[in-house]
């Protein structure tokens, strides 16, 4: 009994020591309750420093930032299974921080976490998507391609948010993206950023510097196939790859019997990025022996992806697309993007493609039109230069002819003078004049063209002068006609006004029944003189200021006229005439109102 207890304690001490060496002391300390460590715990630092050779300094360990080491020791949940490891070098959260509570069964963990193959596939899709965007911008124009490349680098460097990237990309290309682009970037961009951060830390640079130096690994079409999703990791050190220690060897005999049923699941928990992490130097197993040389990375990645997909998703049948991607030869990876794009274009996308092509054709037509205009301007400038050159050549020729027509003696003396170089210059100029310049039209054709142009100008000026004179004549005639009409209208208006005034005056003078104030029909008579007639008392009062001066005088004149009339009737033999022949002393305002008064007073 004592020996059994001693053997048990010896075994437990060995297990605890082994766990301390391997950094999994939590697993040994608490086998029955749920326990997990954060990726940036000191245990990770210890394990990383122990597993990394002395030639490669470990990446900086900051408690605030997440760990990006290629190997993160994962703890056990009830000692049954590992939490999924990093995707392409980016650690995934342990089981204690997953979406739901961890369970003791491996199937629940498979449902909660994403398989490494799926993560590698999504990362490859993201790289292929960014490369396609950059190529699409280059197809439009080099300037737009440069802008798209800057936007992609800013998105990966986290200097641009996904929404800003989406809006600026649409503004640069004038081409709307699909609706699933923003969710796709939000879901898969952190994988690429963690991978970039990991590679930058290994290279002792910040992500912006590393991406600026290794930009071709992100935007090169040859590195965006699914099997080459971790080419960014391969660029740091091609011969310094190490393998994460096998989980069965790492945890030893402490595995519970539940996992003995599926031993093939052990390699599937290691992502392709962890198998070939970019660490310098050789890697060592927990027993201190170096790992054997691994086979080519692509072969391992394909096997890992296929096995992980088969065992983790065994409850669902693989889709036709997955089988096609898995069984496609590696030589056809360059044409995979074109085939997928050709087969996945919808009617709306075809309409957008045609719209884009129409826009490109319109741009080409505009460029052709601008080029044609530029050539026309250049041709006109060349013609103007030729005309000016011919003009000066003709003037110089005329001047030379005049000089030649001068004195022959002076020319003879100049020819005999050895100092004067004029004959040589004249010969050179004569040779220049008679030698036709290459590309220039003969002078006769230019003269005819000038004469034709001048004739056209003269005809145009003549026609213009005729048109101007005709327009002036028509305008003058129109002004004269309108002026005559206006004068006739004014004269007619004046004549009509004069006739109306005379008619009114004559009507007032001829009417004996009209009012002396307003000219209407009179109904009353002035009681003072019985001569003035008014239409009413109002008009009589209005006219009294004028009428009272003559009202009494008229009455006195009538009384004085009555007295001689009576005396003449007594002495009929006197020489005085009849009272009808004697004019009154004072005449009324008008002769018409005085007539009835005379008629009325005569019988008296």
From Swiss-Prot:
Q: Where are the zinc fingers (MYND-type)?
A: 515-551
Q: Where in the cell is it found?
A: Nucleus
Region (Nervy homology region 2 (NHR2)): which ranges? 337-383
In this chain, composition skew of type Basic and acidic residues spans 238-264
- Which residues make up the annotated site Breakpoint for translocation to form AML1-MTG8 in AML-M2? 30-31
One function term, GO molecular function aspect: DNA-binding transcription factor binding
Outcome when changing residue 357 to R: Disrupts tetramerization, disrupts AML1-MTG8/ETO interaction with TCF12, decreases AML1-MTG8/ETO interaction with RUNX1T1, CBFA2T3 and CBFA2T2
Q: Which domain of life is it from?
A: Eukaryota
Region annotation (Nervy homology region 3 (NHR3)) ranges: 443-492
Quote the annotated effect of residue 170 to A: Abolishes interaction with corepressor
Q: Which GO terms describe its cellular component?
A: nuclear matrix; nucleoplasm; nucleus
Please list the tissues where expression of this protein has been recorded: Most abundantly expressed in brain. Lower levels in lung, heart, testis and ovary.
Comp. bias intervals (Polar residues): 63-86, 271-285, 557-576
Substitution effect: residue 361 to E: Disrupts tetramerization, disrupts AML1-MTG8/ETO interaction with TCF12, decreases AML1-MTG8/ETO interaction with RUNX1T1, CBFA2T3 and CBFA2T2
GO annotation, biological process:
DNA-templated transcription; negative regulation of DNA-templated transcription; negative regulation of fat cell differentiation
Region annotation (Important for oligomerization) maps to 337-383
Comment field on protein domains? The TAFH domain mediates interaction with transcription regulators. Nervy homology region 2 (NHR2) mediates homo- and possibly heterotypic oligomerization by forming a four-helix bundle tetrameric structure.
Linked disorder? A chromosomal aberration involving RUNX1T1 is frequently found in acute myeloid leukemia with maturation (AML-M2). Translocation t(8;21)(q22;q22) with RUNX1/AML1 that results in the production of AML1-MTG8/ETO fusion protein.
Q: What does this protein do?
A: Transcriptional corepressor which facilitates transcriptional repression via its association with DNA-binding transcription factors and recruitment of other corepressors and histone-modifying enzymes. Can repress the expression of MMP7 in a ZBTB33-dependent manner. Can repress transactivation mediated by TCF12. Acts as a negative regulator of adipogenesis. The AML1-MTG8/ETO fusion protein frequently found in leukemic cells is involved in leukemogenesis and contributes to hematopoietic stem/progenitor cell self-renewal.
Q: What is this protein called?
A: Protein CBFA2T1
Organism of origin is: Homo sapiens
């Amino acid at each position: 009994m004592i020996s059994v207890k001693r053997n048990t304690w010896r075994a437990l001490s060995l297990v605890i020591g082994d766990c301390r060496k391997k950094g999994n002391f939590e697993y040994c300390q608490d086998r029955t309750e749920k326990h997990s460590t954060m990726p940036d715990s000191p245990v990770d630092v210890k394990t990383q420093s122990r597993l990394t050779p002395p030639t490669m300094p470990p990446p900086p360990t900051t408690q605030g930032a997440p760990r990006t080491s290629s190997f993160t020791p994962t703890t056990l949940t009830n000692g049954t299974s590992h939490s999924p490891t990093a995707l392409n070098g980016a650690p995934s959260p342990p089981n204690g921080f997953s979406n739901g509570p961890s369970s003791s069964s491996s199937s629940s963990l498979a449902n909660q976490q994403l398989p490494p193959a799926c993560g590698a596939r999504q990362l490859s899709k993201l790289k292929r998507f960014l490369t396609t965007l950059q190529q699409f911008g280059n197809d439009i124009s080099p300037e737009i391609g440069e802008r798209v490349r800057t936007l992609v680098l800013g998105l990966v460097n986290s200097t641009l948010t996904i929404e800003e990237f989406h809006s600026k990309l649409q503004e640069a290309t004038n081409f709307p993206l699909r609706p699933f682009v923003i969710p796709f970037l939000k879901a898969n961009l952190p994988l690429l950023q963690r991978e970039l951060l990991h590679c930058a830390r290994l290279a002792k640079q910040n992500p912006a510097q590393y991406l600026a130096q290794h930009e071709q690994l992100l935007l090169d079409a040859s590195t965006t196939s699914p099997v080459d999703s971790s080419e960014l990791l391969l660029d740091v050190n091609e011969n310094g790859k190490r393998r994460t220690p096998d989980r069965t060897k790492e945890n030893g005999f402490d595995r519970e019997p539940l996992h003995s049923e599926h031993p093939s699941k052990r390699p599937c928990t290691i992502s392709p990025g962890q198998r070939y992490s970019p660490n310098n130097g050789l890697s060592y197993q927990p027993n201190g022996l170096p790992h054997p040389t691994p086979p080519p990375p692509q072969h391992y990645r394909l096997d890992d992806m296929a096995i992980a997909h088969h065992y983790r998703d065994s409850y669902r049948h693989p889709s036709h697309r997955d089988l096609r991607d898995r069984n496609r030869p590696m030589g056809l990876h360059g044409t995979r993007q074109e085939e997928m794009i050709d087969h996945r274009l919808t009617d709306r996308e075809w309409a957008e493609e045609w719209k884009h092509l129409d826009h490109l054709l319109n741009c080409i037509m505009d460029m052709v039109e601008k080029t044609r205009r530029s050539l026309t301007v250049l041709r006109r400038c060349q013609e103007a230069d030729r005309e000016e050159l011919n003009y000066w050549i003709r003037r110089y020729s005329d001047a030379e002819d005049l000089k030649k027509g001068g004195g022959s003696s002076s020319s003879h003396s100049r020819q005999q003078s050895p100092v004067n170089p004029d004959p040589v210059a004249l010969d050179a100029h004569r040779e220049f004049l008679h030698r036709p310049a290459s590309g220039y039209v003969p002078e006769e054709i230019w003269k005819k063209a000038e004469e034709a142009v001048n004739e056209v100008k003269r005809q145009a000026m003549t026609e213009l002068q005729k048109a101007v004179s005709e327009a002036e004549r028509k305008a003058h005639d129109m002004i004269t006609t309108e002026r005559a009409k206006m004068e006739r209208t004014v004269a007619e208006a004046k004549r009509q006004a004069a006739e109306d005034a005379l008619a009114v005056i004559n009507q007032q003078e001829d009417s004996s029944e009209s009012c002396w104030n307003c000219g209407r029909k009179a109904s009353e008579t002035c009681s003072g003189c019985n001569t003035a007639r008014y239409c009413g008392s109002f008009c009589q009062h209005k006219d009294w200021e004028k009428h009272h001066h003559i009202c009494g005088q008229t009455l006195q004149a009538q009384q004085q006229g009555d007295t001689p009339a009576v005396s003449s009737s007594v002495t009929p033999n006197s020489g005085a005439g009849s009272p009808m022949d004697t004019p009154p002393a004072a005449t009324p305002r008008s002769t018409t109102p005085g007539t009835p008064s005379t008629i009325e007073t005569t019988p008296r």
